[in-house]
Amino acid sequence: MIRTFFLALVLSLASAAAQSADLQSFGRGSWSKLRAAHDGQPTVVHFWGLTCAPCLVEMPEWGKLRAERPDMRLVMVAADPVPQDPTRVSEMLARADLGKAENWAFTDRFNERLRYEIDPAWAGELPRTLLIDRDGKETVLSGVADLAEVRAWLDTQKTR
């Protein structure tokens, strides 16, 4: 019985560690690196948080959209006002079928600096979605995103 419990515990910890491996640390300079990595590619960047109830409600819908549009460049950024436990962030992403998306989490306690790098006018409201076209032009969706609008934007970008 104890061996079974110990084995289950080890497997559980290994699973959590594997999920966390997909979570990148978002600190100073990460936004410019992220933008450079996706330069010239239509990209959806969704900012969400564990402490944001509307974010948690819409997460499974983002997972469905990603499954529906496997070629879509979707970047999920956990942008809680206070950095959260990476394991909890990874678990939420996995539950929403987003564990294999490009996932980041704010790790700087001075998140105002991170938000300023992204958009000097952003006060930190969540959820927030940026639709970035091939030319780098951003469309900002503040609040729960209308995924029909996101799909329509993806269609204009020829993203499936």
Sequence positions of predicted segments:
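Boundary at the C-terminal end of the N-terminal hydrophobic targeting segment
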Residues: 16-20
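Short, internal strand/loop/helix patches
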Residues: 93-126
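Loop/turn elements at helix/coil->beta-strand transitions in domains of secreted/extracellular proteins
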Residues: 39-43, 70-73, 99-101
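Bacterial N-terminal signal peptides
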Residues: 4-14
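Thiol-/selenol-based redox modules, centered on thioredoxin-like
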Residues: 126-160
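Structural microenvironment flanking redox-active thiols in thiol-disulfide oxidoreductases
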Residues: 57-97, 111-113
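Aromatic-flanked redox-active Cys/Sec active sites in thiol-based oxidoreductases
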Residues: 46-52
